[in-house]
């Protein structure tokens, strides 16, 4: 982080740990860069005065409070943190409307939906077609997932991503989180969101309108495109890289998700229908279970067993506050540790 700070010369840098902050301050003593840490540091980053757009890309529910602070400071939000809307969408979306703040999606699928909505804001959405690659185990049955190793689950066929999201993609939990995120971002009912398995990852998602027209966003699987679109919206600066060549496309195929095998998606839909703090229990259980799997403490299929058990164990809260959301997370962690 010292190298990045020296290269980009930000006004402020924050780290998670106080001791790390002290070391970084010493390392950057010959610069004018301020160093903070912890939640206070995150909130300072999210609200600092020269900033006009905040990219929220923190993994997990740590992103909730800084995002709320950024909205209250009237910063445009480029959202890459699914958990913020999955667990606190009922807080974030009304708050953004109250402060007149735009939330621009960074995830490729939600960016595709957002792009497909441009110029059509007055036309009613019939359905959102949320595409999924299907992950490395597409086409397998549940019995074939016994004995899956960490290295097997980390081999995504199309995208290069971090470990946690790659595991989430393999279980289709990630797509479940994206369904909940789409519900909040685009103000639609769950019944209007349809997951479509599209192994080639060329169509990144689509919107069907009431007149039968379907508008989709296509492109190569390049994460830089949706990131740049959020940062420069509504402009589209030139971007180097591979281009989509329609003449080289052999097939574009589509299939329904197998909810019997990939129960993570089914459980996410169940959590979304339940509402309240149940999506938080779902998300927290998945975070901890994936960490256990990556550390080879549990088997692959136990990820879903843990999620289901935590959802059943959660005490329902219809309209949870941020503190209650975080308490639900702690309760899920405690339940798993037992």
What are these regions (language model features)?
Residues 1-338:
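Catalytic, metal-anchored helix/loop core of enzyme active sites in primary metabolism
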């Amino acid at each position: 982080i010292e190298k990045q700070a020296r290269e980009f010369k930000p006004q402020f840098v924050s780290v998670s740990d106080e001791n790390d902050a002290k070391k970084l301050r010493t390392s950057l003593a010959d610069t004018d860069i301020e160093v903070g840490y912890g939640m206070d540091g995150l909130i300072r980053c999210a609200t600092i005065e020269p900033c006009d757009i905040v990219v929220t890309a923190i993994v997990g529910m740590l992103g909730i409070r800084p995002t709320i602070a950024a909205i209250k400071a009237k910063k445009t939000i480029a959202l890459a943190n699914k958990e913020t809307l999955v667990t606190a969408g009922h807080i974030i979306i009304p708050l953004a409307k109250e402060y007149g703040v735009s939330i621009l999606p960074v995830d490729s699928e939600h960016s595709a939906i957002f792009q497909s909505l441009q110029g059509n804001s007055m036309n009613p959405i019939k359905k959102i077609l949320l595409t999924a690659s299907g992950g490395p185990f597409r086409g397998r049955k549940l019995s074939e997932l016994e004995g899956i190793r960490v290295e097997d689950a980390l081999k995504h066929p199309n995208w290069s991503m971090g470990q946690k999201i790659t595991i989430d993609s393999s279980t289709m939990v990630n797509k479940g989180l994206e369904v909940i995120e789409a519900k909040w971002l685009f103000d639609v009912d769950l019944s209007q969101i349809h997951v479509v398995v599209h192994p080639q990852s060329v169509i990144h998602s689509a919107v069907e309108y009431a007149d039968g027209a379907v508008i989709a966003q296509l492109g190569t699987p390049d994460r830089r495109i949706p990131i740049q679109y959020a940062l420069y919206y509504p402009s589209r600066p030139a971007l180097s890289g591979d281009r989509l060549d329609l003449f080289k496309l052999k097939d574009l195929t589509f299939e329904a998700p197998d909810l019997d095998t990939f129960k993570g998606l089914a459980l996410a839909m169940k959590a979304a229908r339940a509402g309240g703090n149940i999506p938080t229990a779902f998300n927290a259980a998945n975070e901890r279970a994936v960490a256990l799997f990556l550390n080879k403490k549990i088997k692959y299929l136990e990820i879903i067993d843990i999620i289901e058990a935590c959802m059943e164990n959660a005490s329902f809260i219809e309209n949870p506050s941020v503190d209650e959301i975080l308490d639900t997370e702690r309760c899920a962690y405690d339940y798993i540790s037992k």
